Amino acid sequence: MNTENRQPAPDRPHQTARTESVKECQHRRPLVSTRSWLAAILLAFASPCLADSSAVWNLNPTSGNWNTAANWTPATVPGGVTGTARFGVSNVTQVSNSSFVAIGTISFSRGASAFTITGTPSNGISFVGQGIVNDSGVVQNFVVAADQAGGAGTIVFTESSRAGRMAQFTCNAPTSVGTGLPVIAFEISANAGSAIFDNLGGVTSGAIGGQTDFFDQCSAANATLVNEGALVTGAIGGMTYFVLRADAGHAVITSKGSAVGGGGGGGTVFESTAKGADATLIAEGGNNGGGGGTIQFWDSSDGGLAKVRVSGNGNLDISKHSAAPIRIGSLEGDGPVYLGSKRLTVGNNNLSTIYSGTMQDGGTNGGAGGSLTKSGSGSLTLGGNNTYTGGTTVSAGSLLVNGTTGSGAVNVDAGTLGGGGTMTGAVTIGTGSGGGAFLAPAGGTKIQATLTLQSGLTFNAGATYTYTFKARKKKAKSDKVIANGVTINSGASIALSGQSKGAVTPGLTLTLIRNTSVNPINGTFANLPDGGIVTINGNNFQANYGGGDGNDLTLTVVQ
């Protein structure tokens, strides 16, 4: 497994020494200290000195300092659960805090100026009420800052506060190793609304990037989040974490790759019992030797209906998941997928997608024996050369293999297996306890295909082989299955579908199954006995289970 350009997500013990190499950063994840900081905020807010008050930012304030009472009307610094800071037209639109701010609502009135409100290093802004209400008609900017002295700002949404709409958040990266963490955090039941969040990549070797965290029962809602790649060698990209029962809602979350050799890509991580919900999760590749973005599922998290898209060396990694299987809605793109020893179930959102990357064992947590299950009513087309060593299961919809599956066995419990690729492991169609399992090389398309099985093929009772062809006079294009040994158990059937232009020349032979084993085909389809004649589009075909080189299933046109 090539992991040269793949940057793992940082682990989460306390923020102590940050002089490790980028690879060592994977053993650290800075959320514990983040929660400690949030606890301090709540204690501070509980203090009686934080009385509720509301005020309007002046047209001509004396400075851009939030904490200067003279900048407001009435001359009081707004704060508290029911407190509202109102912004309209002003000649000073760069606003920052010199001490901690706890505010219920920041409101931008219709026609208000475009503001930039910055949480300065070592000072936080906490929304403890409604959150942000923007009626101005323009985007309002919020910035989490960091400085060379190690200070880091923070913006926190807690209780049921909302980030609102037409709001742009930028979370800067620490400017040195071992310093405070700039973070945007959502606590209790807050959500991100339809805001935009940009977590900037690391700017110092060994340091992390900006970070947005969702805790408890918070949701990313309809937000757009971008985790940027690192800007220097040895740094880590911006990150988004979902922890406890938080979910990604309907958000679009993009983890970008780094454009610098040895720089880490951005990352999105789900842990505890967090959920991908109905989000779109994107991991883009890096350039110039930079690491790709990453999407990771840890612990007992669940991908739900999330649409996962990976490209370049941008990757999906489930190797740190502790439960089996881990579900996602759909998978597409050409980036690697790391399974470790886990089972990935794809298809819960019923979409039809094409994945042409490499699905493989390994990942940040290592492990072998990874496996794949296709679920849902849509189709998943595998176009790459997959190397995972566990099995492949089709439980619903269609799995179309135009590349390769892993080396394990392939079982179709329900749904359709097809394509023109290659499978290493033994293939079994049906469970023997009911219908609904199909082998169909064309996979419901109008293009005939040859599916190659390097091991044996078994049709159980209730299974169906769907075979299609197009014929004209002496020529034909047809499906074909190549298998190293074939068993057709009692109760399996074949569905024949052909298109022909006029009468087909007698003697034309179609090979339905090419058996590469020295042994004959064991059994016959219930509706196609050996020597039986079937009529398709006015042409008569005779079945032969000893055709071809003596042990293939063929149909020959007869008078």
Q: Where are the regions that the model predicts?
A:
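Short structural boundary motif marking the start of a folded domain
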Residues: 52-56, 342, 370
